[in-house]
Amino acid sequence: MSHEGEEDLLEYSDNEQEIQVDNTKATEVAGNGEEAADGKDGDKKGSYVGIHSTGFKDFLLKPELSRAIIDCGFEHPSEVQQHTIPQSIHGTDVLCQAKSGLGKTAVFVLSTLQQLDPVPGEVSVVVLCNARELAYQIRNEYLRFSKYMPDVKTAVFYGGTDTRKDIELLKNKDTAPHIVVATPGRLKALVRDNNIDLSHVKNFVIDECDKVLEELDMRRDVQDIFRATPRDKQVMMFSATLSQEIRPICRRFLQNPLEIFVDDEAKLTLHGLQQYYIRLEEREKNRKLAQLLDDLEFNQVIIFVKSTLRANELTKLLNASNFPAITVHGHMRQEERIARYKAFKEFEKRICVSTDVFGRGIDIERINLAINYDMPSEADQYLHRVGRAGRFGTKGLAISLVSSKDDEEVLAKIQERFDVKITEFPEEGVDPSTYLNT
């Protein structure tokens, strides 16, 4: 629980990049699932000894949650879920870094729903994230797992929409949410204008916490929201990448947290994901992309480009070449972005061309092919991009088109950063059984 020491959090310098924190009570879980701490302070929060559950039933969740989990087809928890849920459902603060596709969202959704005792008109859970699409997706996960909890109401708030609609929803006792999923800027505005009461919040979650807290303006918004909540609450933070520099900042919000680092930082690439590169000239990319789309078997594919202009032009070319495609980027109207995201998620299109707006956190189950038409500028972004394929430990295929010296350098950094060997795409192609789930 986070309570004492909140003043220290709220007074730290915004330009402080490294903070020395006494965090000896926290526990780190290494990639092999064994406890990394020395085992002392066994009665304190974070002193976790390995529990390897064979099924979600072992977590002793509410019957309503168990039914929803069965409906979703989940039988066995992932590694991060095994390590985290047994403690998080009892209110333990959590700092969790685990690779994409391991079900981090389900950890905090199930944990907060398990603890939720809905009171009409009271917000009990706040979830913050950095992207509107991600907020929308998290809201949908809450709806999916709370389907047998009819009294639970969830709402999503983000910028670019009419604030009056948010206020109307909040002031109506019939629609006022118990769970709020939001981007920091919009929620801060609602708090500032006294349009939302956070004095009853029991769970405070930050998803993609590194992105949320590394930007000073967004971090200030989070602090203002944090001040509006009670001192006695659970705080949980999650991300696929969590640098050594950002961890002390995260810990300022936490008290004696359970720290879960599933797989060490050098091995964050996904199990089951086949990764290849193709070396070619820039002018050869369109022909090679068409060949790949013709030759490869896939359910849905996401193609990453480096700019809005290239996204629009490539989508036009694909549609003209009889490859029905949809594009999503950050420069379109908010309503249009959400509509296109929904259309792709609901399988109305099999091909999506996107900038990095879809490169972090977005979860669409049918994607099993990711193509870097343009290489990312940094190694971490590669992880988030290719993580769209092979979600939840399933198979997938990632192909990167390498056309410049800069691309070669990024490819080398990716292999060094994640301790992975990315091989050249075979001329004869690849066996579909290596990247398709049977």
UniProtKB/Swiss-Prot annotation:
InterPro entries xref list: DEAD/DEAH_box_helicase_dom, Helicase_ATP-bd, Helicase_C-like, P-loop_NTPase, RNA_helicase_DEAD_Q_motif
Stretches the record annotates as Disordered: 1-44
Alphabetical list of Gene3D superfamilies matching this protein: P-loop containing nucleotide triphosphate hydrolases
Motif Q motif per UniProt: ranges: 54-82
Gene Ontology BP term (one): mRNA splicing, via spliceosome
Enzyme Commission (EC) number: 3.6.4.13
Protein's recorded name: ATP-dependent RNA helicase SUB2
Subcellular location: Nucleus
Record: residues binding ATP: A98, K99, S100, G101, L102, G103, K104, T105
Residues covered by the Helicase C-terminal domain: 272-433
Catalytic activity annotation: ATP + H2O = ADP + phosphate + H(+)
UniProt domain comment: The Q motif is unique to and characteristic of the DEAD box family of RNA helicases and controls ATP binding and hydrolysis.
Keyword Nucleus listed: yes
Residue ranges annotated for the Helicase ATP-binding domain, each copy included: 85-260
GO-annotated cellular components: spliceosomal complex
Location, primary (coarse class): nucleus
Top-rank taxon, per record: Eukaryota
Keywords, comma-separated and alphabetical: ATP-binding, Helicase, Hydrolase, mRNA processing, mRNA splicing, mRNA transport, Nucleotide-binding, Nucleus, RNA-binding, Spliceosome, Transport
Motif extent (DECD box): 207-210
Residue ranges, compositional bias (Acidic residues): 1-19
Protein's job: ATP-binding RNA helicase involved in transcription elongation and required for the export of mRNA out of the nucleus. SUB2 also plays a role in pre-mRNA splicing and spliceosome assembly. May be involved in rDNA and telomeric silencing, and maintenance of genome integrity.
